[in-house]
Amino acid sequence: MKLQQLLSYTRRAIDDYQMIEEGDNIAVGISGGKDSLTLLYALHGLKRFYPKKFDLQAITVDLGYEGFDLSGVTKLCEELEVPYTVVKTDIGKIIFQDRKESSPCSLCAKMRKGALNERVKELGCNKVAYAHHMDDIVETMILSMLFEGRFYSFSPKTYLDRMELTVIRPLMYVKEADVIGFKNKYNLPVVKSPCKVDGYTKRQYAKKLVAQLNREHPGAKDRMFRAILNGNIKGWPEKAIKM
């Protein structure tokens, strides 16, 4: 996927759900993976011509694992002239050594988001951008149906009352295959996750299930995504731009 196509998908999502307003200070949550680095590129590119002016910075929560080398990400942020903050934590140690969690993902995500949002507020940002793409939204819906018995997926835009922060997901119209293509084309400095359960989670199961359904029923993933968009899910804002 070329940058221009990425910017088109990103702007469409932002306009559809009014994700960005004049004067916003937006922090991009950077895990070091392909998705978050693609989002950084997209918002940096959009910032140059989007009619509503906004500031942009990047932030990573370091879980404390050995070998988590962010030098490539640091260099990229310097090249893009985007301020970059790394939050050092012991979350990995707390999860696996202190608490010895057998199913760590939920607690880890909660602690990571807490650390991220706290620093985002300290940096003076009013919005935080997460790099969830179309596949993530569909997979979350599958997980919610299988394990919670409800039709749900996370919203394009969510206001966190307690933190007085708005979460936005500008990559919601971008497919993971396109993110992979963008990563390869632009040689993004992806940092491999050092987490010991990476690739062995319920989300990975959902990813394989969706891929299988899409192979057996071509277009199934797109149809599931449309069902989510049209599903009147609680907490989802209405689209500002009607098609």
Show the residue positions of the predicted features.
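A short, charged, Gly/Pro-tolerant segment at domain boundaries
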Residues: R215, G219-M243
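Electropositive phosphate-/nucleotide-binding environments in soluble metabolic enzymes
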Residues: Q4, L37, G67, K110, ...
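Residue-level detector of flexible, active-site-proximal loop/helix-junction positions
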Residues: Y65, I91-K93, T158, V174, ...
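Solvent-exposed amphipathic alpha-helical surface segments
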Residues: Y17, L46, Y50, L213-E216, ...
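Catalytic subdomain that performs nucleotidyl-dependent activation
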Residues: L56, D136-R215
